[in-house]
Amino acid sequence: ALPPVCVHTPLEATIALQGHPPVHVKVQRTLLTDQGDTRVYAQTLASSEAHVSLPLGTRVPGTYMYHIMGTSDAYYADARPDTKALEYRVWPQPQAAWAPATPARRSACLGDTWAQAPTLQLRGTPPFRVDIEARPVHTEGHADAMRFTHTVHGTQWAVALPAPFQVPGTWEVRVLRVEDAHCRQDGSQPPPVVVDVVESAGVVAPTTREHYCVGERMDFVLQGTPPWTVTYTFDGATSRVTSR
């Protein structure tokens, strides 16, 4: 048996030939797919050399078996099949996808990670190594992308960022690469999750004044994303106002 390989890995075998050229070799390939299907394919190779190359299939994950069903040369034909088989395993590439109903856009507060982490579903053989990038798209200041690798021992992971968002604006969180116990997937990753990072709601006084005249207005600066609802107490009475 040959060592297992990942899907789409180039692979071939060399068959030694004896006889008067040209020598013809009948080969039968049997594929047992991971879905339980059996596929049989026959082909004939011809060569005037002492060896002939046999391309081996790796396009579909599963177990492959090759048998030589018969040979013939310029003078003789041997229809007896070879009892020995060439066998090997083709592993599928791991896959990652966001769990169903995961919103394509979510929000997070400045200086914090997201309140509800999206769940990444993984297909393959654990453990998985997942490369994640959180990169700024449109921010209110300079921000560096965050890249990190996380090992997942199951098939689901609630994506937790290693550091909080430090700059408000729009960020994208994307899967760069997924690797399982056998293979690696660099392309065909799920679409990114867009994160709107906003300042936490707050009320800031623009001045340190403590005394005001009767009828004079007291101004405050609102932090966060409108509309704001502010509840305050003055002279023993509680009031609520909305500002847009």
Residue ranges and their predicted role:
Residues 1-244:
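Extracellular low-complexity Ser/Thr/Asn/Gly-rich intrinsically disordered segments
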